[in-house]
Amino acid sequence: MALINFDLLAELPLAYQAFAPTVDVLPLIPLFFFLLVFVWQAAVGFR
């Protein structure tokens, strides 16, 4: 059984540390599209 050190995967590599705030927001983008569907349908009157 291979043991994986998840602590290594918990942080971005040093070269990408500047992008950490962006990476934190990326998982939320699909939720914004999901909510946009309801806003769009409300705008067109739920046809």
Curated annotation (Swiss-Prot):
Presence of the UniProt keyword Transmembrane helix in the record: yes
Swiss-Prot/TrEMBL keywords: Membrane, Photosynthesis, Photosystem II, Reaction center, Thylakoid, Transmembrane, Transmembrane helix
Compartments in which it is found: Cellular thylakoid membrane
Residues spanning the signal sequence: none
GO CC terms: photosystem II reaction center; plasma membrane-derived thylakoid membrane
Any single Pfam family the record assigns to this protein: PsbK
BP term (GO), one: photosynthesis
Stretches assigned to coiled coil: none
Membrane topology (UniProt): Single-pass membrane protein
Propeptide: 1-10
InterPro entries to which the protein is assigned, alphabetical: PSII_PsbK, PSII_PsbK_sf
Task of the protein: One of the components of the core complex of photosystem II (PSII). PSII is a light-driven water:plastoquinone oxidoreductase that uses light energy to abstract electrons from H(2)O, generating O(2) and a proton gradient subsequently used for ATP formation. It consists of a core antenna complex that captures photons, and an electron transfer chain that converts photonic excitation into a charge separation.
Subunit structure as annotated in this protein's UniProt entry: PSII is composed of 1 copy each of membrane proteins PsbA, PsbB, PsbC, PsbD, PsbE, PsbF, PsbH, PsbI, PsbJ, PsbK, PsbL, PsbM, PsbT, PsbX, PsbY, Psb30/Ycf12, peripheral proteins PsbO, CyanoQ (PsbQ), PsbU, PsbV and a large number of cofactors. It forms dimeric complexes.
Family statement: Belongs to the PsbK family.
UniProt xrefs under PANTHER family: PHOTOSYSTEM II REACTION CENTER PROTEIN K, PTHR35325
Protein known as: Photosystem II reaction center protein K
Species name: Prochlorococcus marinus (strain NATL2A)
Upper taxonomic lineage: Bacteria, Bacillati, Cyanobacteriota, Cyanophyceae, Synechococcales
